A protein has these predicted regions:
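Extended, low-polarity transmembrane helix blocks
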Residues: 1-30, 50-57, 62, 69-164
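Membrane-interface interhelical connector segments
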Residues: 29-50
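Short polybasic/polar patches that bind polyanions
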Residues: 42-44, 67, 128
Length: 164
């Protein structure tokens, strides 16, 4: 794969994921009861801490915008991947297993319940791995280069580890 195709793939993934997350995040933030209603539902029905119930909608909404423009992309995609992992396996999967109609094919019902959060988890994981690409604010502002400059150099890290 060439650098250009990787950049195009990253752009397509970012735009598609952002376009999907944006209305989902907005509906939770601006919907009836806002994040408080969403957080209460997550705490009551799924045992998810209220703080995370408040954080998830904002992660989806702000994360969508950051993905689309390609700013803080790897961190953003990592947070969104975590949110989608919880959505797929803690919220959707148990509910699907519990509420399968008697005449339904169980595996299809379960897959259908988790397919969107699972696909979004995969998209975000791919973005974490390939990065934002050159068509992003991260590339324009050299965010990843600046972050790497803050990290200890390999030699210094090895020397520090040898002291321990």
């Amino acid at each position: 794969m060439t650098k250009v195709t990787t950049d195009v793939a990253a752009l397509i993934l970012r735009l598609a994921a952002g376009a999907i997350f944006l209305p989902h995040g907005w509906s939770k933030v601006a919907g009836e009861g806002g994040t408080a209603a969403f957080a209460a539902d997550m705490a009551t029905n799924y045992g998810i801490p209220t703080f995370l119930g408040h954080l998830a909608p904002w992660t989806e909404l702000v994360g969508a915008i950051l993905l689309i423009v390609g700013l803080l992309t790897r961190l953003d995609a990592l947070l969104l991947a975590g949110t989608m992992f919880v959505a797929a396996f803690i919220v959707q999967l148990p509910e699907a297993l519990y509420e399968v109609p008697p005449d339904a094919i169980k595996s299809f019902v379960v897959l259908r319940a988790i397919e969107l959060p699972l696909a979004m988890f995969a998209a975000c994981a791919a973005i974490v791995l390939i990065g934002p690409g050159r068509v992003s604010l991260d590339a324009l502002l050299r965010v990843e280069e600046r972050f790497r400059a803050l990290l200890p150099k390999k030699k210094a890290a090895a020397e520090a580890a040898a002291l321990v």
